């Protein structure tokens, strides 16, 4: 059995794999990550491998304390990836974007792939049908958009995600919800159409914490999977061997 760990900007997500199938997932904070992982290992004593990717504050050393119980595989830019990297500044490319791109190559061979990760930030990554990573785009995610409008204005309230009642909001709160949710939806749809216009044999992969919410709003046919990064870590570990 394998335990994969995705250390994000705001939380940690994990998945336990048995025969390459997820049998359980969990979410927890950076503060109590050690006790949470120990609890998972205690409840699943057949776990032999811990696979980690981190864009958050926890680095490799934080997970080496588990090396007396399991083999720890820390995915980094020095790991082996199944694509050619054409990014101009490879040292700045987030490991989460690299892992997601690897997963797209593994699960959808010989296709042009656009991977959209809806988390703290919204990231777009494009890997072509020849397995060449070309780059993408980064913009604020849902929660960040709400927070920025509150933090950088004098009177706009801080709201949490809510489905807008209409396109044209008739209160300040509804205007904020419409701006965040509809604005982000239009952005994603527009980006998809721009990429589609230049590429055939095209698949869209939507993942991240807000994937399920956004999937219902998008007109395009997409493959939505909130566990895609965790699955990609499992596949990438197999690829290292």
Swiss-Prot record:
Compartments where found: Cytoplasm
Question: So where does substrate get bound?
Answer: 94-97, 172
Role according to the record: Catalyzes the phosphorylation of pantothenate (Pan), the first step in CoA biosynthesis.
Q: Which cofactors is this protein said to need? A: NH4(+); K(+)
Q: What is this protein called?
A: Type III pantothenate kinase
Q: Which UniProt keywords apply?
A: ATP-binding, Coenzyme A biosynthesis, Cytoplasm, Kinase, Metal-binding, Nucleotide-binding, Potassium, Transferase
Tell me its EC number(s), please: 2.7.1.33
Q: What class of enzyme is it?
A: transferase
Instruction: Supply one GO molecular-function term.
Output: pantothenate kinase activity
* Pathway where it operates: Cofactor biosynthesis; coenzyme A biosynthesis; CoA from (R)-pantothenate: step 1/5
Q: GO:BP terms for this protein?
A: coenzyme A biosynthetic process
Q: Which Pfam families match?
A: Pan_kinase
Record-annotated residues binding ATP?
6-13, 120
Organism domain of life: Bacteria
Summarize the subunit comment.
Homodimer.
* Entry annotation: catalytic residues: 96
Q: How is the cofactor bound?
A: A monovalent cation. Ammonium or potassium.
Q: Entry's InterPro entries?
A: ATPase_NBD, Type_III_PanK
Record's catalysed reaction(s) = (R)-pantothenate + ATP = (R)-4'-phosphopantothenate + ADP + H(+)
């Amino acid at each position: 059995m394998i335990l994969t760990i995705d250390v994000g900007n705001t939380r940690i997500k994990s998945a336990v794999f048995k025969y390459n199938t997820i049998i359980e997932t969990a979410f927890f904070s950076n503060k109590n990550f050690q006790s949470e992982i120990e609890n998972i290992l205690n409840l699943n004593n057949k776990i032999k491998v811990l696979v980690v990717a981190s864009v958050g504050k926890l680095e490799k050393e934080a997970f080496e304390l588990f090396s007396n119980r399991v083999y720890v595989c820390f995915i980094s830019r020095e790991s082996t990836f199944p694509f050619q990297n054409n990014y101009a500044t490879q040292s700045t490319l987030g490991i989460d974007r690299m892992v997601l791109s690897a997963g797209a190559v593994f699960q959808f061979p010989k296709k042009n792939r656009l991977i959209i990760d809806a988390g703290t930030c919204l990231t777009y990554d494009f890997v072509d049908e020849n397995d060449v990573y070309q780059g993408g785009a980064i913009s604020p995610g849902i929660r960040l958009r709400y927070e920025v409008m509150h933090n950088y204005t004098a009177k706009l309230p801080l709201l949490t995600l809510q489905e807008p009642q209409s396109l044209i909001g008739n209160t300040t709160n509804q205007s904020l919800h419409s701006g965040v949710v509809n604005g982000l939806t239009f952005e994603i749809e527009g980006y998809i159409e721009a990429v589609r216009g230049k590429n055939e044999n095209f698949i869209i992969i939507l993942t991240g914490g807000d994937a399920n919410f956004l999937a219902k709003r998008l007109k395009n046919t997409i493959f939505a999977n909130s566990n895609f990064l965790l699955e990609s870590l499992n596949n990438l570990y197999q690829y290292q061997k």
